[in-house]
Amino acid sequence: MPIRIDKKLPAVEILRTENIFVMDDQRAAHQDIRPLKILILNLMPQKMVTETQLLRHLANTPLQLDIDFLYMESHRSKTTRSEHMETFYKTFPEVKDEYFDGMIITGAPVEHLPFEEVDYWEEFTQVLEWSKTHVYSTLHICWGAQAGLYLRYGVEKYQMDSKLSGIYPQDTLKEGHLLFRGFDDSYVSPHSRHTEISKEEILNKTNLEILSEGPQVGVSILASRDLREIYSFGHLEYDRDTLAKEYFRDCDAGLAPHIPENYFKDDDVNQTPCLCWSSSAALFFSNWVNYAVYQETPFDWRKIEDDASAYGYL
C-alpha cells in the first residue's frame, strides 16, 4: 500500500528507488480508489480447490478485489457439478462487454494434446484476444502460460522425457524487479508438468523479460516490461498436499509416476510433505496485485480507447 509523507523528506527518493509507493498530500487528496476487478479463467479440473488456492493468496492484499470466475462453455467439466458452475461462474458472452484490471488464467491437464486439439481452444483464443483491450494485466499459469505464449508469439511447447514434479530452486534474475520485491536471490516453488518451452525461442520470438529460472525447471517466470503479460510455469498457488494428491492419483491410475522431488522427507511418501514456498507465493501474488494492477490501471476504464495500442500492448 502507498504511504503518504512530506515529499521533502530525504527518505522519499531512497524509498522510490526501492519501488516503495510514496505519495504527497496533493496526490493523496485526489486519489481515486475503487475495487479492483479480477477475472479468473479456471481451467483446472478440481475447480473448488483451485478457487480456494487463488483466493487465499489474493486475499492477502488490503485492497478490495471484486472476483469473477469464467469457464469455457465449449467444455463440460467431469469433476465439478454443473450446479456449481452455473451458480458461481460466468460465460464469455456474459463478461465480454466488461473491463477487468487483472485476469488469471490457470493451468489445465491438456498438455498431451496439440493446442488446436483442445476442445475449448477456439473459445480460449477469443478470450485471449479480447483480453488485449479489456484486461490490463494477465497472469498465465503453467499450461495457461504455454498457451498464451503460443497464441501471442508462436512459442511451441515440447514434451519432456518424464514428468517434472516436485519443489525446485529458482534464481531471480532482475534485482529490484517489482514482481519480486521482497524475494531473496533464490526461492523454491512447485512444478508439475510434462512439457516445457525453449529459452532460445523466448529470446528470439518475444521481447519478454526472463525474471527467474532454475537448473531443473528452466525458464520459470517471464513478463512484458509493462507487466501486462506475466507467464509463470510453476504453481506457487499450490497447497502443501497438492503434489501428493497428484502423485497418488497417478499411482491409482497405474502410471507409475516418479516420487515428487524435494518434497517428501527422505522420499518417504508416508511422511508429511514439506511446505517451503508459501511466503514466496504470498509475495508474488501481492506484488502482482499491487504493482501490475493497482498502481497501473485507470480509475475509469471507459476513458481508455478500445485499442490495444492505448495500453502500449507489446
From Swiss-Prot:
SUPFAM superfamilies referenced in this protein's UniProt entry, alphabetically: Class I glutamine amidotransferase-like
EC number: 2.3.1.31
Cellular component terms (Gene Ontology): cytoplasm
Binding-site residues for substrate, renumbered to this chain: K163, S192, R249
Keyword Cytoplasm included in the entry's annotation: yes
Main subcellular localisation: cytoplasm
Active-site residue list: C142 (acyl-thioester intermediate), H235 (proton acceptor), E237
One protein family per Pfam: HTS
Single GO term (MF): homoserine O-acetyltransferase activity
Residues at the site labelled Important for substrate specificity: S192
Reaction(s) catalysed by this chain's protein: L-homoserine + acetyl-CoA = O-acetyl-L-homoserine + CoA
Feature type site, description Important for acyl-CoA specificity: E111
Annotated keywords: Acyltransferase, Amino-acid biosynthesis, Cytoplasm, Methionine biosynthesis, Transferase
Biological-process GO terms, alphabetical: L-methionine biosynthetic process from homoserine via O-succinyl-L-homoserine and cystathionine
Keyword Cytoplasm set for record: yes
Disulfide-linked positions: none
Cell compartment(s), UniProt: Cytoplasm
NCBIfam families the record matches: metA
PANTHER family (alphabetical): HOMOSERINE O-SUCCINYLTRANSFERASE
Role noted for this protein: Transfers an acetyl group from acetyl-CoA to L-homoserine, forming acetyl-L-homoserine.
Similarity annotation: Belongs to the MetA family.
Protein name per its UniProtKB record: Homoserine O-acetyltransferase
Protein species of origin: Streptococcus pneumoniae (strain Taiwan19F-14)
